[in-house]
């Protein structure tokens, strides 16, 4: 039974197929003017790199099914003069490769001239037009300050190259119209003034390479008869049709006139930041490959090494940054950027939550450690009070200041019990029975219980034996006066009444903490000290039970 289109089974089957099926590789989309490699990490290369004799794609698909033309010349790292094979007036683009790291290409678009200069591959020279009006000699000094001179020409191709260039620059124009006149490096010397002016062209500055000389010039309308040397002006046209047909003329003008001028200098190494590089230094040539590193040799980049960058992940259309190596700009539609922003937001939220949880855990650990420390101190204080039994005094213990060494000092919460007032053992682990520490027994144990309640036992001072004697073992027989007549009359305190129970006597004895001494017989006025008790003998000594 085939499930219906709107059934849940069909939907689950469709989702299962989408999950199991391997996603197809997105179609490569290269910009116009680029060749799409069939495979590998390199997907798009410039179209002129196809069939140039050197494979660029990893699968060498750019060199497949290519006719052999011989126009592309691969060169190795060996001693190769990069100027070999150059023909003046020919194709200015050449491809050179170096067997170091990745293949490298050289062409006329690589910066060999500073900004504002036009490079001509035929003579390896750079040209620039200065539109500021100066006389001939000032113009020559300006060209010398930029390591050049007023332009001269060695071939017709070089002259055509200069005439075909667009010299419009953001500078103040001097007398700019559809035609222009430029000071160049020639001078016309007058040799005779018979029927007409006769003379010849000469190079204004000695030391210039072999050049061709212009044809007969057009003289200025106003000429001084005293002038024997005139300076050359090249007249060219700004209109594109006339310029492309190489229309020009030569004029002999007074050297004091002000005009624009054309400077010429040898090509030089220029880095990607438009800085001139000296001979023998490493630099990144000016161009569209910021990952190229070369050595400057005779104004050209040689011994170059290029870095191969990995294509950006998650981006189908991208463009290289012309100023920074291995930096790309994604050209995908805005949809991917929306997902990227959402992913960035989710990462930010997850980071905030993780940071909050970690901080909370740290705070809880600090609080728990402080709580355990407080509980430990409280347990130490409670154990101290329990061991010393400050609420009730124990019989037989000495509570004087020397009883415990330094006495009892209050234990504060700041005292952790280590090296402070008291010395305690570490607290026991949790969930175990607490073991009380061993206590040292006193040297003099307390008297037994029977001795403490025996009325016959007395404490006496041996030094008082001369004045007192111990009481006889048996009490005298009572007389008519009863028990009170049998007791010595010099004692102030009477005995406890007969009806007092033994338990009350024990309680009174336990609560007593002072040693009672007999009063001074001299202070008693009721009975004379010389009165002898009945029965004869010495005066009996007063005795009371003393219990600590």
Swiss-Prot record:
SUPFAM superfamilies per record: C-type lectin-like, LDL receptor-like module
Annotated segments matching region Disordered: 415-548
Main location: membrane
Cytoplasmic compartment segments: 367-548
Alphabetized UniProt keyword annotations: Cell adhesion, Disulfide bond, Glycoprotein, Lectin, Membrane, Phosphoprotein, Receptor, Signal, Transmembrane, Transmembrane helix
Signal peptide positions (record): 1-24
Tissue specificity field: Ubiquitous in various organs with low abundance.
Stretches assigned to the C-type lectin domain: 113-239
InterPro entries: C-type_lectin-like, C-type_lectin-like/link_sf, CTDL_fold, DGCR2-like_CTLD, IDD, LDL_receptor-like_sf, LDLR_class-A_CS, LDrepeatLR_classA_rpt
Classification via CDD domains: CLECT_DGCR2_like, LDLa
GO cellular component, one term: membrane
Protein's cellular compartments: Membrane
GO biological process: cell adhesion; response to xenobiotic stimulus
Membrane topology according to the record: Single-pass type I membrane protein
Positions of the VWFC domain: 268-331
PANTHER family assigned: INTEGRAL MEMBRANE PROTEIN DGCR2/IDD, INTEGRAL MEMBRANE PROTEIN DGCR2_IDD
Disulfide pattern: 30-44, 37-57, 51-66, 143-263, 236-255
Modified residues (Phosphoserine): 379
Domain LDL-receptor class A stretches: 28-68
Protein's UniProt keywords contain Glycoprotein: yes
Transmembrane segments: 348-366
Annotated protein name in UniProt: Integral membrane protein DGCR2/IDD
Extracellular topological segments: 25-347
């Amino acid at each position: 039974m085939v499930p219906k289109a709107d059934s849940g089974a069909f939907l689950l089957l469709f989702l299962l197929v989408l999950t199991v099926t391997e996603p197809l590789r997105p179609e490569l989309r290269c910009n116009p003017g680029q060749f799409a490699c069939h495979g590998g990490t390199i997907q798009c290369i410039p179209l002129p790199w196809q069939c140039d004799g050197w494979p660029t794609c990893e699968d060498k698909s750019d060199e497949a099914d290519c006719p052999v033309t011989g126009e592309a010349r691969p060169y190795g790292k060996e001693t190769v003069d990069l100027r070999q094979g150059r023909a003046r007036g020919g194709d200015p683009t050449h491809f050179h490769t170096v067997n170091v790291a990745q293949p490298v290409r050289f062409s006329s678009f690589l910066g060999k001239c500073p900004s504002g200069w036009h490079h001509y591959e035929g003579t390896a020279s750079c040209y620039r037009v200065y539109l500021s009006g100066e006389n001939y000699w000032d113009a020559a000094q300006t060209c010398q300050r930029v390591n050049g001179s007023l332009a001269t020409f060695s071939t017709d191709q070089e002259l055509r190259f200069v005439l075909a260039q667009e010299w419009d620059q953001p500078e103040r124009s001097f007398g700019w119209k559809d035609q222009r006149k430029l000071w160049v490096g020639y001078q016309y010397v007058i040799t005779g003034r018979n029927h007409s002016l006769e003379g010849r062209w000469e190079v204004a500055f000695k030391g210039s390479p072999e050049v061709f000389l212009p044809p007969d010039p057009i003289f200025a309308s106003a000429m001084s008869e005293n002038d024997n040397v005139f300076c050359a002006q090249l007249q060219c046209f700004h209109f594109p049709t006339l310029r492309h047909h190489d229309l020009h003329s030569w004029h002999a003008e007074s050297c004091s006139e002000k005009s624009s001028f054309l400077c010429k200098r040898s090509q030089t190494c220029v880095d990607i930041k438009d800085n001139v590089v000296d001979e023998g230094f490493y630099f990144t040539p000016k161009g569209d490959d910021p990952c190229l590193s070369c050595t400057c040799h005779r104004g050209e980049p040689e011994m170059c090494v290029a870095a191969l960058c990995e294509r950006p992940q998650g981006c189908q259309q991208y463009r290289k940054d012309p100023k920074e190596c291995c930096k790309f700009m994604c050209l995908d539609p805005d949809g991917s950027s929306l997902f990227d922003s959402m992913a960035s937001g989710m990462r930010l939220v997850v980071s905030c939550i993780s940071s909050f949880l970690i901080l909370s855990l740290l705070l809880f650990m600090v609080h728990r450690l402080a709580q355990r420390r407080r509980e430990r101190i409280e347990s130490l204080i409670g154990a101290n009070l329990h061991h010393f039994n400050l609420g009730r005094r124990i019989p037989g213990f000495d509570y004087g200041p020397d009883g415990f060494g330094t006495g009892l000092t209050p234990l504060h919460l700041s005292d952790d019990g280590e090296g402070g007032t008291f010395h305690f053992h570490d607290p026991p682990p949790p969930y175990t029975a607490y073991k009380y520490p061993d206590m040292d027994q006193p040297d003099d144990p307390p008297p037994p219980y029977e001795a403490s309640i025996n009325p016959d036992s007395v404490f006496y001072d041996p030094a008082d034996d001369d004045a007192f004697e111990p009481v006889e073992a048996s009490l005298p027989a009572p007389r008519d006066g009863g028990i009170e007549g049998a007791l010595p009359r010099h004692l102030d305190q009477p005995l406890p009444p007969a009806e007092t129970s033994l338990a009350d006597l024990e309680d009174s004895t336990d609560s007593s903490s002072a040693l009672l001494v007999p009063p001074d017989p001299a202070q008693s006025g009721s009975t004379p000290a010389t009165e002898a008790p009945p029965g004869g003998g010495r005066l009996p000594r007063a005795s009371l039970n003393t219990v600590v």
